[in-house]
Amino acid sequence: MAVVMDGVKKNIIDRTIPNLVKKFQNFNNDDIAYFLKLLHETGIDLFEINRDSMDKIKKFPLNLDYIYRIENIEDYNYLNNYNFKYIILNYKTIYRFLLEDEKIQKNLKEHNIILEIDIEDLDELYLSEDNKIFCIFNIVCLRINNLSKLDFIDEDFRIKDLKSKFNVLVDFCASNKYNMATAIIINAFLNGSDIITTEFNSNDYAAMEEVIIALKSIRNIEIRGDLKLISKLTRIYEKITSERVYSMKPILGEDIFKYESGIHADGIAKNPKNYEPFNPELIGTNRKLYIGKHSGKAALVVKFKELNLNCNNIDMNLFLQDIREKSIQEKRNVLDNEIIEMYKEYNKSYQR
């Protein structure tokens, strides 16, 4: 699985698991395994985990590629038990491992390392004349962390310069401090980043679902995965967390493709692109027309077609009036089965 732009394969790292582990205590291993499986089939290549993840989740799917974060010596103890694709070391803490015994240093040198560095420390790395860590460790990727604004000047040039100067791949992990993480990650992707780091349904980082749907629907980037699984991902995520995803959450919310007003309904019937940035079928769901007190005749005609009802058999204006009255009386929309029952009653009265 991967994302392909102009024939170049790029990878996506998912870091959902560490944040789930941080927020919640108990997990069903089968649910976690299914969640990771769906993420992989959606198009995620690499899964970031840490020691807390390993402590609380006893069984990870073996056919996936994992990245292991090491922040201290206690984290190191898990390193030899699993075959990790990469390990993550932070720029501020990597030097402490040079003070450890030679056995630990030697072991770390045998692994492919993603060096994570906060954006504010990047100049320090650039200006350092003695970047011995690049000689000592096998650093294959540089992750730019905590980028919170679209102010990475001459981003295309900077990314190329990073690759050239340090002979590494470049990964971006943006902070959502100013609600710009998704835009930052998309911009980095389009400007040469080899890897992007996201999180499912995230408020802290770039939301995975927003990034891949934006790349697909706006830029028509090739996503080598089944995006229709996103609706299933949402359901298993809700099961794991015992929390409902916000109903109007972009991409994931269950109400984002619901509509009622007459003009809206008529417009979608004629051309959905007037109202929808992408077809709901792309993510394995459907649009839903609700009929209620705000609905007009055009919306009712669309609903009749949806329910295979013949609008020529009855007085649609009178039927609409009854629909509105029922909606006001019940203080909600009128359900499909109720519309069908009302239609049957109307037909009976016409036949008498």
Swiss-Prot record:
An example molecular function term from Gene Ontology annotations: homocitrate synthase activity
Catalytic activity line of the entry: acetyl-CoA + 2-oxoglutarate + H2O = (2R)-homocitrate + CoA + H(+)
One annotated GO biological process: nitrogen fixation
InterPro entries in alphabetical order: LeuA/HCS_post-cat
EC number: 2.3.3.14
Enzyme class: transferase
Additional free-text comment from the UniProt record: In Clostridium pasteurianum the N-terminal and C-terminal portions of NifV are encoded by two different genes, nifV-alpha and nifV-omega.
Family that this chain belongs to: Belongs to the alpha-IPM synthase/homocitrate synthase family.
Assembly mode: Heterodimer of an alpha and an omega chain.
Entry protein name: Homocitrate synthase, omega subunit
Natural source organism: Clostridium pasteurianum
Gene: nifV-OMEGA
